[in-house]
Amino acid sequence: MTMKTKRIASLLLAVAMLVLPVLPAFAAEEDSYTYVALGDSITTGVGLKDTHFSTTAKSYDVQENYHDYSKDCYVARVADALGLDRDHAVNYGMPAAMSSNILDLVRTGSTASGVAYYDLPTLRQELADADLITLLIGSNDTVLQLMGAMGRATNGKATKLLIPLLTGTMRELNLQTLQTLKKGLENLDLTPEELKAALKLLDSGMEEICDQTRGQTVANVEQILQELRTLNPDAQIILVGYYNPLPFLPTYGRHFRLLNRSVKALAQQYGADYVSIPYTSIANDGHPTVCGHKYIARQILKAVRK
């Protein structure tokens, strides 16, 4: 071996010695990429096969679903596309959660009040360590207010019908669903006063509820984004917009158009990426179908920077 050849070999060996220790570090860094999904029952995957949740005295038990969620939900599809296993992609979808509940969770790790009570002591640290965070929250703010108002207008009679509709019991549009719905409507047995109050609510009352809740939803989403940025200045945050879960109600269409416009502006303000999902395919219960989840995942993946 000539002196020149020896020098070249020595140089290559030195470079190899410098590079080789770095390669495992890159692999470890790749392995440590984590995704945390925050949201309500849409994120949970309610209505999909193999979604794990059950009712409890206080709320819903979804602990098993944090990691063992349906392969058809948008969280799974995003995780799979990014090559993440279930230890690196966590589904914190909370059935019945409102924006105020998620705000409590990111601030303290538990929900202070509301329909849904959840306790996630490790959440804040997981958010601080995450590389990607998706947030889809706010639809329930208006839906639950509407349910409450309809229950009061009908002295609780309508609630018995609304709960099965919204929890997936009558998810599929088939003969059995139509028969169940027909029977439920017949059994309402509303008095003339209750019927008048219900119709008034569906007419002008709903618009009032939407206008009242929209401002609070926007304020809560802004505070969630502030808290996420404080916890993790470097993570990519994707703020997912809203589809109309009740397309047969025109007032809701206007409400979600205005809400999308507001949260899109918030995303820009806090360095987040806004994703629009207006064409989500939904079932009778207002939750996305398998195709709907595919669509949401595609929209999110278009925005992911990995």
What are these regions (language model features)?
Residues 6-18:
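Sec-dependent N-terminal signal peptides
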Residues 19-31:
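Sec-dependent signal peptide cleavage junction
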Residues 29-69:
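Short glycine-rich His-centered loop
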Residues 34-39, 43-45, 88-93, 131-136, ...:
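Structural recognition of the beta-strand scaffold that forms the well-ordered cores
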Residues 54-189, 196-203, 207, 211:
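Conserved SGNH/GDSL esterase-like catalytic core that processes O-acyl groups on lipids
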Residues 197-218, 246-252, 285:
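Surface-exposed cleft-lining segments at the edges of enzyme active sites
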Residues 215-219, 227, 244-276:
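Substrate-gating cap/lid alpha-helix
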Residues 264, 284-306:
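Histidine-centered active-site loop/cap adjacent to the catalytic His
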